[in-house]
Amino acid sequence: MSAATRFGRNWRPGILALLAGGYLVAMVVTGALPRQRQLIEFEARGLMREPPESVVRVEVTRAGVQSVFLRDGAKGWTLVGGGAITPEAARHVSMAVQFLNTSEPLRYLAQKELVGMTPAAFGLDRPVVTARVHNAQGPLIAVNFGTDNPEGSAQYMSVDGRDGVYLISRFVGSEWSAVAATGSTR
């Protein structure tokens, strides 16, 4: 192999390294980071628009038993009348609140689609779990979880003050059931 051929092949990696280095220097000088256009930015699409961190009080009712949880700054969640709760129970409360903010309903059944149907058809005449969420200024949202859909993958839910019925992923209702169980075992 001649010296010219070897030189012809070896200069390409050097040029590519110089171009990459120049690109990095340009990014440092301008302060710009490369934008990942293939990634989608997160957007909360739940029924509660306020950030979960703003929630300071949660009231959960199941089978006529109400439990009230308060967020106490650094101490985390406490159960009114029961004091501190386990870290696992606190995670259930935090996740349940977060799901109200982040989990978009799978479907919304408008009132006009429900003509001739009663709340009992969705288990909302006697909800499995009812949750009321408050921030420092007052109530944010009150939701009622009914029965599962026929496939068992989702659950019917209504929101106080709003018409219609929502179909929400089953894990949302399961988390609220876990919160209710935490309060009722005390």
Predicted regions and their residues:
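A short-motif feature that recognizes glycine-rich, charge-decorated loops
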Residues: M1-R186
